Each structure stands twice: as structure tokens, then as C-alpha cells.
Amino acid sequence: MPESELKRFYIVREHPVRIISKCKSHSKGTLGSFLIGFCLFYAVVSWVPQILSEFIPATNIDLFATYTDADPAMLSQLPATPLVIILYSVFFSGVFKLSECVYTLTYIRNRQADYRAFTESFSYYLKTLGIYIVQLLLVAFWSMFFIIPGIIVALNFSQAFYILADDPDKSISEVLTESKIMMHGNKMNYVRLLLYYVPYFMIAYIPATLASAAAAKFSLNEPVLLIITLLTDIPIFAARGIMSMGRTVFYELMINKGFADFRYAGQDAFRELETR
């Protein structure tokens, strides 16, 4: 890879604790409004396919049984996933990822939650679909050669939707190539940052775990179980929103080459610890 390309971006060496601390400082007084928007968005995104699957229960197993000669005993061992959830994920995950990036970038840069940011990505639906499908195919292909190559490919493309959010005119190949260049030397640091958010998710999953145990004990009917499941998803969405801020700041560090060069509303929150 040409050295000139590598020099365009910054190797993030800031410790994850430092990044998380600065995110907390930045979000004082506005975290609630940010998480409300984030949770509402992902509530709609996650609940729609779950509700639809109650009315369209056909699964991937039903499809295999109808159109293939696969052994029924073997099919019964496979996990059954409603087709509506599979199709929904393939056709809408890309645009939802871009919506998250636009919303969180807007919040980090302007220090205010702008719910209109969620709708802007739909103008670029076909491009987001193309990026997501290319990512999906490449990760699936490289995962066939053990899991590690697939993880590396996923990390290489992890900044694609942030790049698209900053410049929607870039082509699919330009976005993916730039993401790969940005992540050169940053993959392990990025993974380390994500691992620091594991405790947030462990806490967030407690309500869902308790609800699952209660459902098994009291044999709740399907509608009640669905409502409980939807409600216990909310803490998980909140944890995802908090992690999204850290991921976004990581992207900002790469393009701004460190905290000192942040140039937007709220920049002082990221600089106030620089002298300590």
C-alpha cells in the first residue's frame, strides 16, 4: 500500500478509557436526548420484523423443505429464522447503519441530538444496499477459510458507512477502499475499544435474561412474551447507543489525527483532559 495513502490517516493510540471518558464529558446534559432518539430508532428497526414475523411465520426451514430434497431430520436440527427477518435484514441493514452513523456524527459534531438525521440516509438507499451486500459476501467468503480472515475483512470495512455519511457522492468501491486504508494499523485498537463496552452490554442484557427465565417458568402466551421481549430490548439499544459514540469518536480521531484537531461544537469536551 502506498505510503502516501497511509499518511492520510491517523493511528489511534488513545486508550479506550480515555475515549470513553471524553465521550461522557461531551454528552453531559444531552445524553438523554441522544439515547431517546437512538432507542426509538432501533426500537422501530428491530420491532417491525419481529411483529411482521408473527403474521408471516414462514421460516428458512420451510423454504428448504419446499424447494429442496434435504433430509427433514437434518433440517430439524437447523435454527429456524422467519424469512421476513432475513429479507428485512438484507434489504435494510445498510440504510439503517448509515442512519446510525449520520445521527451519531451529527451529535458528536454539534453536541445536540437531531432526529431528522435518521431520515437523510434513505436518499442513498441503493448505495447503502450495495455496500452492505458487498460486505456481507466478502465476509462470508473469507469466513470459509476459518473465522479470523472473515473478522479481518469485517474490521477493514467497519468505517465504510461513516465515510459515506461524510461524502455520499463516493462510489461503493471508493468507500470500501478508503475504509480498508483507514483501518490499516487500527484494527486491534478498534477491537480493544469495542471490548471495553462489553460490561455495558452485560448489564443491558440482565432484564432480557430475567424475562426469559420468567417466561420459561410461567409459560407466558406469545403476545405477552413478544411485548416483554420488545421492552427488554430497550436497555440493549441504549448500550448500543453509548458504544456508537465511542465508535464515532474513533472514526473522528482517524480523520482529525488526534483530539487536539477536533474543530466543532463540543470540541472542548475532548480537549479538556489533554493537559492532565
Question: Can you say where each PLM-predicted feature lies in the sequence?
Answer:
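Juxtamembrane transition segments at transmembrane-helix termini in multipass membrane proteins
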Residues: P2-Y10, E14, R18, K22, ...
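Residue-level hotspots within the lipid-embedded alpha helices of multi-pass solute transporters
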Residues: Y10, F38, Y42, I86-G94, ...
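Membrane-interface helix starts
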Residues: K24-C39, L126-G130, H184-R192
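Hydrophobic alpha-helical transmembrane segments of multi-pass membrane transport/permease proteins
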Residues: G32-E54, Y88, F92, L138, ...
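Hydrophobic alpha-helical transmembrane segments
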Residues: F34-I36, L83-L87, L129, V191, ...
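Selected alpha-helical membrane-embedding segments in polytopic membrane proteins
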Residues: A43, W47-Q50, P72-I108
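Alpha-helical membrane-spanning segments of integral membrane proteins, especially the hydrophobic core
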Residues: A73-V90, D114-S143
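Hydrophobic, aromatic-rich membrane-embedded alpha-helical segments
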Residues: V90, G94, S121, L137-Q159, ...
